[in-house]
């Protein structure tokens, strides 16, 4: 690779010319390939995998930037359902290279088990198309045990739980932030040194959790085997992404996990995940500059769902909520827990847009609303009868908000066969246009079913 400019091209300013720019060679304004980012705009489970699957058919590179196997995507291709937790769902496309970035935390047994399960369904050649950053942190089995212990302790001391997936994600990110975590490069380096660090890490956790037992020798033996299986896939992630950005033209896609309202900084804290699920996480989790971010697509259901506990202003604890749960098959891919359901909340979507700067929205599962007589949309929050102009950081306050709704007549007809905008009932079109105008972001896709063919492209 050749560069068009370097520090040697600077001229000395010992005797500056009258025109400071005279004779100076400036760096070329060439930012390289742009990256398209797909992000959840609610509490997860919005259908990001479907949008990624749609875009991945034309993508050269599909990347994960944060989270771990706590995420869950279901993708339907030619009638087959593929479940992804850690692998980028773009791995289905035989022409795509998939990247697991440094911001992802990797449970190696889970990674290989997931790949093998999808192999049985028809996934081929994944190991030759997967790149893993050497800077990614490792999730160990004891991290998962600690995750469960912490949840039990929260229940005992506070009477409430976070609703963690118990996949060890939080403890692993805690190890990372405490600078005691272990990375892929450690595993593939001097194994004797890795073993010492691993034992020290186990001892630190055992000093905090007396009930934690770990068979270190057995674990190390397995980790060494997993490391050798992983070795051919590992690259310097920063250099790999730089080459991809500044080499020949490429379509690069970043597949966000979780969602805006689960972001460690901007979500409904503390009922959040442990990583940045917003657009900044794409930069820090892959080592790419903000200048290379191109399109940012937000994904939202035509209603709202949430797994686990935490404030949910538009939740419907009634027959409507049950109908949405049943018709939408709202069960978590990772946890198997039923999702809580409610009306679409535009306060949340506007908030997610403030943080992410969406260039377009995918509105999924419109067909689930087909049977409703009337449909409501949350427009604003009120406290003591007064509108508040922001999304509250204080969860106690969020629990107390009163939602101001706009009510629409239902279209009472089947939209699942629609493949073009004009195939949708007028009342459904009105609903979509209303949502679009009040978020201030164009809706690019409307989903009316499980498969990629059920995504109506608007422009």
Curated annotation (Swiss-Prot):
Amino-acid positions noted as binding IMP in the UniProt annotation, renumbered to this chain: 45-48, 70-73, 165, 179, 258, 273, 337
Listed Gene3D superfamilies: Adenylosuccinate Synthetase, subunit A, domain 1, Adenylosuccinate Synthetase, subunit A, domain 2, Adenylosuccinate Synthetase, subunit A, domain 3
EC number, as in UniProt: 6.3.4.4
Residues where Mg(2+) binds: 45, 72
Places the protein is found: Cytoplasm
Cofactor note: Binds 1 Mg(2+) ion per subunit.
UniProt entry keywords in alphabetical sequence: Cytoplasm, GTP-binding, Ligase, Magnesium, Metal-binding, Nucleotide-binding, Purine biosynthesis
Residues forming the catalytic site: 45 (proton acceptor), 73 (proton donor)
GO CC, alphabetical: cytoplasm
CDD domains: AdSS
Pathway participation: Purine metabolism; AMP biosynthesis via de novo pathway; AMP from IMP: step 1/2
Primary location group: cytoplasm
Biased composition, class Polar residues, residue ranges: 13-22
Domain of life: Eukaryota
InterPro entries assigned to the protein according to its UniProt record, in alphabetical order: Adenylosuccin_syn_GTP-bd, Adenylosuccin_syn_Lys_AS, Adenylosuccinate_synth_dom1, Adenylosuccinate_synth_dom2, Adenylosuccinate_synth_dom3, Adenylosuccinate_synthetase, AdSS_1_vert, P-loop_NTPase
Residues bound to substrate: 45, 333-339
Molecular function (Gene Ontology), one example: GTP binding
Binding positions for GTP per the UniProt entry: 44-50, 72-74, 339, 365-367, 447-450
Region (Disordered): 1-31
Pfam families referenced in this protein's UniProt entry, alphabetically: Adenylsucc_synt
NCBIfam families: PRK01117.1, purA
Summary of subunit composition and partner proteins: Homodimer.
Role: Component of the purine nucleotide cycle (PNC), which interconverts IMP and AMP to regulate the nucleotide levels in various tissues, and which contributes to glycolysis and ammoniagenesis. Catalyzes the first committed step in the biosynthesis of AMP from IMP.
Family (UniProt): Belongs to the adenylosuccinate synthetase family.
Protein name, entry field: Adenylosuccinate synthetase isozyme 1 C
Organismal lineage: Eukaryota, Metazoa, Chordata, Craniata, Vertebrata
Gene that specifies this protein: adss1c
